């Protein structure tokens, strides 16, 4: 599986141009992308990290990291996914960085999703949806999610980079992913959720034994 993740990471490097500021996601496939990026770090201007973990990895490779607030133009964002379909709709957030990932993805002109073939699905929903929640609202939000048909589980011992908690929600209906994304976000106490149906991936680079294909 690591070989496929490396393939996908290498394929994303082809989209990196000189003097670019690059948004960098979070997760195991992205970690391989960071390794590849380190080889051309002299060509790029800097990176914007979607998590403290990614920032630490970038800095360890000697890659400059800048704050998103100092960026006016972010041409590209590279990130993985827990699930992705052919339309570029995704479930993300298994690593708990979903809020910052969604922010950086929305700032970027182009969102490139890098995955191995196991992440490609016809219908989203096997993987639970991570929901970032203000701690005091945990029980209330969980009750509201149950009303939506979901089964929330508190992610024990995990605190997001924003100081919040995560509810992992199983068995949600994905008949209309965009409506689901909205219905979760309007619950008071919800910061963000891991359904990416409004900000789609522009390119989905899928690695398999036969090579890397663009799903979109």
Swiss-Prot record:
GO BP annotations listed: D-ribose metabolic process; pentose-phosphate shunt, non-oxidative branch
Gene3D superfamilies in the record: 3.30.70.260, 3.40.50.1360
UniProt-annotated binding residues for substrate: 26-29, 79-82, 92-95, 119
Active site (UniProt): 101
GO cellular component: cytosol
Pathway connected to this protein: Carbohydrate degradation; pentose phosphate pathway; D-ribose 5-phosphate from D-ribulose 5-phosphate (non-oxidative stage): step 1/1
One term of GO molecular function: ribose-5-phosphate isomerase activity
Catalytic reaction(s) noted: aldehydo-D-ribose 5-phosphate = D-ribulose 5-phosphate
Tagged with keyword Transmembrane: no
CDD domains noted in UniProt: RPI_A
Keyword field: Isomerase
InterPro entries linked: NagB/RpiA_transferase-like, Ribose5P_isomerase_typA_subgr, Ribose5P_isomerase_type_A
NCBIfam families per UniProt: PRK00702.1 (NF001924), rpiA (TIGR00021)
HAMAP family: Rib_5P_isom_A
Self-association state and partner proteins as the record states: Homodimer.
Function summary: Catalyzes the reversible conversion of ribose-5-phosphate to ribulose 5-phosphate.
Annotated protein name in UniProt: Ribose-5-phosphate isomerase A
Organism this protein belongs to: Legionella pneumophila subsp. pneumophila (strain Philadelphia 1 / ATCC 33152 / DSM 7513)
Gene: rpiA
